[in-house]
Amino acid sequence: MGSLRAILKNPEDLYPLVKLKLAARHAEKQIPPSPNWGFCYSMLHKVSRSFALVIQQLPVELRDAVCIFYLVLRALDTVEDDTSIPTDVKVPILISFHQHVYDREWHFSCGTKEYKVLMDQFHHVSTAFLELRKHYQQAIEDITMRMGAGMAKFICKEVETTDDYDEYCHYVAGLVGLGLSKLFHASEKEDLASDSLSNSMGLFLQKTNIIRDYLEDINEVPKCRMFWPREIWSKYVNKLEELKYEDNSAKAVQCLNDMVTNALPHVEDCLTYMSALRDPSIFRFCAIPQVMAIGTLAMCYDNIEVFRGVVKMRRGLTAKVIDRTRTIADVYGAFFDFSCMLKSKVNNNDPNATKTLKRLEVILKTCRDSGTLNKRKSYIIRSEPNYSPVLIVVIFIILAIILAQLSGNRS
């Protein structure tokens, strides 16, 4: 009923949702039959359905390299995230992880659910890795080595300052941006982007995730994970976990807004990076997550629900982003729309209001100066006509029947 209610409220979401559903089914049908690659792509669908969809934009050879790159780093991240592993065991694994990708026999039991399966059967990933061309292998090994060393450093060190925060985000996400740029260049489809721009692409995504995932991280057992920098949260509370208490709601929202404001300066670099991409498939692969990130920040800003549960874009809006993000004009339009939405939520009494508005105005000016805003459809301002709820219900039922028949024919 929740999905139907959302569609009745936002009927323009229906068509993109159906397209997304069909695309997801098509992607699942594309899983290779070989045991190793079949495991890798099926695992990709389990650990990140959204990434599994986005990766389908890429040409096959590059797609395979990016798939393995993602799974290797996801495995590394699983080791880092498992708070039950003693530090004296975890640190050496993180530091040497780049060597294990060459070992067809290596595996390490940790994580839960699908992540445990990934770690227990890591030999499928390492075997597929060894089938990649050498320059792809070298790029993946280099980034894995640097990321593992950075993660090991922060196992023994808390995120105290905003510089620490940027450094941690560089290790766990900025390096992903550098690695992807290397893979794109190795495929001979793109020029090699600068490290600073590639780093910003990763930092913007990672900071968005850290903001959104506050409650999940702080409630982690047996030990909480704390990525918000003390330099920011200590202005509002004595302990980071105090932000989730109702008595601290006003301070929590102010701290949240401070964190969102900290993420905004990366946007200009991201727009510069994306505007230089030539290959349409690589462009979509890079652009869709960035648009999702600015949309998520707009949802999170000034929203106490970040400290109560999960805040994310509605599925219909996500589907719309995936469907409409095709050109740089679409990207500038999306960043303009979501920045306007965020700007409308800024309370002048917020201690960081002036800084937030200044940073948003820089983004809005960049989007205006692109000269492309008249070429896009708004993500937020509804330009489509409102449809009769009865008509929407009828269409929804018909589409459900069609999808059920398609599913039956495939089985």
UniProtKB/Swiss-Prot annotation:
It is a multi-pass membrane protein. The chain crosses the membrane at residues 281-301, 388-408. Keywords: Endoplasmic reticulum, Isoprene biosynthesis, Magnesium, Membrane, Multifunctional enzyme, NADP, Transferase, Transmembrane, Transmembrane helix. It is found in: Endoplasmic reticulum membrane. Its cofactor is Mg(2+). The keyword Endoplasmic reticulum applies. It holds the Pfam family SQS_PSY. GO terms for biological process: farnesyl diphosphate metabolic process; isoprenoid biosynthetic process. Gene3D superfamilies: Farnesyl Diphosphate Synthase. Its EC number is 2.5.1.21. It catalyses: 2 (2E,6E)-farnesyl diphosphate + NADPH + H(+) = squalene + 2 diphosphate + NADP(+); 2 (2E,6E)-farnesyl diphosphate + NADH + H(+) = squalene + 2 diphosphate + NAD(+). One of its GO terms (cellular component) is endoplasmic reticulum membrane. CDD domains: Trans_IPPS_HH. Its main location: endoplasmic reticulum. It is an enzyme of class 2 (transferase). Pathway: Terpene metabolism; lanosterol biosynthesis; lanosterol from farnesyl diphosphate: step 1/3. InterPro entries: Isoprenoid_synthase_dom_sf (IPR008949), Squ/phyt_synthse (IPR002060), Squal_synth-like (IPR006449), Squalene/phytoene_synthase_CS (IPR019845), Trans_IPPS_euk-type (IPR044844), Trans_IPPS_HH (IPR033904). One of its GO terms (molecular function) is squalene synthase [NAD(P)H] activity. PANTHER family: FARNESYL-DIPHOSPHATE FARNESYLTRANSFERASE, SQUALENE SYNTHASE. Belongs to the phytoene/squalene synthase family. This is Squalene synthase. It comes from Nicotiana benthamiana.
